[in-house]
From Swiss-Prot:
This is Glycogen synthase. Synthesizes alpha-1,4-glucan chains using ADP-glucose. GO terms for cellular component: cytosol. Its EC number is 2.4.1.21. GO terms for molecular function: alpha-1,4-glucan glucosyltransferase (ADP-glucose donor) activity; alpha-1,4-glucan glucosyltransferase (UDP-glucose donor) activity. The gene is glgA. ADP-alpha-D-glucose binds at residue 15.
Amino acid sequence: MKILFTASEAWPLVKTGGLGDVAHGLTHALRERRHDVRLLLPAHPDAVAGLEGRIRRHALTLDQRPFTLIEGRLPGTRVTTWLLDDPPLFARAGNPYTTEDGDPWPDNARRYHRLSRVAAALAAGELLPWQAAVLHAHDWQTALAPFLLQRRPVPRPATVFTIHNLAYRGLFPAETHTRLGLPPEAWTPEGLEFHGRLAFIKGGLAYADAITTVSPTYAREIQTPAFGCGLDGLLRHRSGVLHGIVNGIDTTVWNPAADPHLAACYRKPDPAARAANRAALAQRIGLDGDTGERSGPLLGFVGRLVEQKGVDLILAALPRLLAGGARLALLGSGERELEEALRQAARHYPGRVGVHIGYDEGLAHLIEGGCDLFLMPSRFEPCGLNQLYSLRYGTPPVVTATGGLADTVMDVDTDPTAGNGFHLPAANAGALAATVERATAHWRRPAAWKRIQARGMGGDYSWDASAEAYLRLYRNTPGNNGS
């Protein structure tokens, strides 16, 4: 089957979050199943520098505007990758979405309209001698591609749109609709208009042949006012084509048995390896070593420092957590207020709280392999990947039972035979502290703790099941000729 993926990022070329992991992992899994999957990304400088394989350049024109498609291979895979090289739009260093001050690039609407426009034309076979059976677009940055393809005469490629996080909707002033040359008839509440603004994400939600999101629970949640971000009515209307498919992870990259970032690798729960990794992590991030029997668990967090992730709950619960003997290792970046609050916590609790602002792949692996518990007190979580890394590394996660966290983490006390982590009863600081205390009681019983770790490490978190689910969806999507 010929499948065109389009996204704004893909690891290891460009990555700011889980979307980058999915764009890499799912395309790789489909290609390994001998499907002709291609990937279209913006030609950010890091992506151009990282492209592998034989590099070809296709000089093309669309809508009377010249551009180049740089063709190569996604590193570590056999996935043919095209980079949309339009220098005024994408030849910018740093974050692909925001300026150095953290503000969205002022021309983001024009940038991602162009990406969607090229994706639609490429999928339809208008640019190169290759045509897709399915166009699979991801998040608001490419959501106009299904809308643009839907307007074409049949036969046309089937369209699938994946919501990775509904909170990011791609909202722009009303005049953007006209400025981009979008058809007037699409400016309706049933079309691209959203409370007087243009919503890129509605190009996928309202017009794609099939919609997916990254867990069954999140697919149900976004059809409610509490999680629907004002789009729950549209999603209920389209519930017949809305599917929840849990993400996988790259089990070769996230493999505790052969992880070059760990001080000691391990294939099963191994207290000695955990102790070695804990010591390496403590030294790396500036924590005191273990302090004997009164020492509590080492808690870890890796993620974006935003309200969604519950970082403020960790800060509020910190005095109680530390009073119980715990230490905290935290890696992330995001909102400046939270970054500064965490720096202050590290200064206030030297040796007990270690904070690294930014992203460091090696440190992320060491946190997974060196901590005793991993904290994910998210207010909502479409899928989550860190809990899967944690389970694979034998680091039981403490999570809010929402979205993909509810689908992948089973509470030890609710289900003693299958439990692999711990659920917060509510997303607040008191619940977080109480749940960590409950988990700590299990942690202090080594034999029982090893059984909990083993259940987590024994799960299958690869892309295999997810890839098969997507293939079934592609085959059953109207308009797909199976080519």
